[in-house]
Design a protein with these regions (language model features):
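N-terminal alpha/beta PP-like core and its mobile active-site loop of ThDP/TPP-dependent enzymes
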Residues: 1-216
């Protein structure tokens, strides 16, 4: 979470199977509600000892096994367990682009230990690995429907008698803080910030009108 807020680039988190993955849930939930892109890669027991495959009805068969992809489904944009070596590249691609496109958020890739040690044809992965080092690959993708959203906002401001802007950390993530301040000043619209965006506008800025709390 902090890595993205400082660098603007998605963080990659590696955790072990079972307790390690479960202990990461609190941070992943925070990233989900705050729209922070993050790719979590967890270890998992061998594919042939995953309980719901090897012996349906068991709650655990492999050592420290946990059905983590099922557990994180509602707090990630994408989650998948890799069941074959040739699935790995495509799964990593999808998890990365899901994390940084549209509304950003965490994704989760679960990799059983026998898949971790499997042989993979590296020649098929060279292009993917090379692209991961490019600035374009790392850049957070802006929504494609932003013009339509702006039209709605402009109409709402025009039809409001006493408009106020409640600004959140999405403005920081999109690096449009200066534009927000200019809009507030030029249109004479007061600006309030939410709890996780307190540093977005100075208290002495002419448009600043205070911060929202848990009760308003």
């Amino acid at each position: 979470d902090a890595y993205f807020r400082i660098s603007g680039k998605p963080a990659i988190v590696q955790v072990t199977t079972g307790p390690g993955a479960i202990n990461a849930l609190n941070g992943v939930f925070g990233a989900f509600v705050d729209s922070v892109p993050m790719i979590i890669i967890s270890g998992q027991v061998r594919t042939d000892t995953i309980s719901y495959i090897a012996a349906p009805g068991l709650r655990q068969m492999g050592d420290q096994e946990a059905p983590i992809t099922h557990m994180v489904k509602s707090i990630t944009k994408y989650s998948k367990i890799v069941m074959a070596p040739d699935e790995l590249e495509e799964t990593l691609k999808v998890s990365w682009f899901k994390a940084i496109t549209g509304r950003p958020g965490p994704t989760w890739v679960d990799v059983p230990i026998n898949i971790q040690g499997a042989q993979i044809d590296r020649s098929k992965n060279d292009e993917f690995v090379g692209n991961m080092n490019s600035d374009e690959f790392l850049e957070i993708k802006k929504p494609t429907d932003i013009d339509a959203a702006l039209d709605i906002i402009v109409d709402a401001i025009g039809n409001s008698e006493r408009p106020i802007i409640i600004a959140g950390n999405g403005i920081q993530f999109s690096q449009t803080v200066d534009e927000l301040r200019q809009i507030g000043k030029q249109l004479n619209i007061p600006i309030s910030t939410v709890w996780n965006a307190h540093d977005m506008i100075p208290n002495i800025h002419p448009s600043f009108c205070g911060r929202t709390g848990s009760d308003g």
